[in-house]
Amino acid sequence: MTQTVNEREDPLNLGGGGWASSIPLRTWPSYHRRQRGAPMSKRRYRDGPKTEYEAPRKQPKQQHIPGPWFQPPRGPYWALYSNWGRCGGPWRPPLVAFQSPLCPAQMIRAYGLHPLCVCCCSCWNGPWNPGWERPPGRKKRWGRRGRGLRRHPRRSFPRNPPIDLSKMLRPVNLYGWRAPGMRAPRNTTQFIMNQVYEDMRQQEKLERQQAALRAHQAQAGGISPGDSTTNDAPQSGAEEDSQLPEDLYGFMQDPSLTFSPAPGQQNQSPTPGLVEEEEKNVDDDECDEEVCDEKEESEEEEVDGESEDEDVDEEEVEEAGNGEEREEDQEEEDVSEEAGLEEGEQREEDKFLPLGMPLSILVGDEEERENFMNYDYLSQEQIIPNVPEADLFMVPDISH
């Protein structure tokens, strides 16, 4: 073929069947329809998508060309004389006719034979397939099948034993599962404040009951002698006089009573003790005069005993003075034991702080509080001493 179909594609008229010809001779493909004026480089399924629009290369790259009869493409140079099969399938050792006897170095290199042992035994641990022999320039990466795979998929268990996490110090899981009723861990500020306020409410309740009990005692001490005969009138007045210092002394000793709730609150919510006492008073009015007289006499004796104990306590306090607080505490305990169970409970309740008390008294220990100056007990002259003005402006001479 001396004439090309398209001169623009083959300007040198190199037509022919050579590998450098612009239009190699081949049979028409089944999908090809020859039209008048259509170029030979019509798009074919093996060529790229731009064959119609681009002129082919002047010297096309050499491909695997079939020879005079079909042969599979040749492998790379390093696999020419290896035992790898060409077309896949199971590996078969090459025919003995094509093998030359291997020297010891080749046997050691190919089959991993130990150089000190040249026998046919189990020490020939190399596989028949020398696939581990790589082309030059390649590196064997021991211990992994592929480049990116770190763990063999066939290995069902890890080589290293699992770490026991229970022996390690784990961080606190603040946002994990909690009990259904808990909004936060038990040691948070909210929980502590709830406890504090609950204690304060309980203390306020106890204090209210205690104040109501004191008021009822004072009321009972003033009313019950009035119901008695006219001969007992001066005695009832004396009991009222003794009850008044007793209440004053209680207020002096326990400042929490000064913050008791208003009487309107007490009247709104009377304690069960008050209700019981009112029922007792109704029963007393209904009972016989003789029984009433006996009860009144017994009550008067108890009140007299309490007032005498309180008078003795007041005298001892006046003699002791302000400096002996420990003795006062002991005397108070003795008096409370003698007064009975109600008075003992009352003293125990007095130990708690009410809501209105300043919390500054809780700051610091007793020893620390003693070191601070209490300005309530100092006069104006002690706080600001009268010093002559000449002494104020004197600068001490420190040169000598």
Swiss-Prot record:
It is found in: Nucleus. Residues 299-335 form a coiled coil. Disulfide bonds: none annotated. It holds the Pfam family CCER1. Residues 1-68, 134-164, 203-353 are annotated as: Disordered. Residues 275-347 have a biased composition (Acidic residues). It comes from Rattus norvegicus (Rat). Residues 255-271 have a biased composition (Polar residues). InterPro entries: CCER1 (IPR027889), Coiled-coil_domain (IPR052696). It comes from the Eukaryota. Keywords: Coiled coil, Differentiation, Nucleus, Spermatogenesis. Residues 1-11, 46-57 have a biased composition (Basic and acidic residues). One of its GO terms (biological process) is sperm DNA condensation. GO terms for cellular component: nucleus. Residues 31-45, 137-157 have a biased composition (Basic residues). Its main location: nucleus. This is Coiled-coil domain-containing glutamate-rich protein 1. Residues 209-220 have a biased composition (Low complexity).
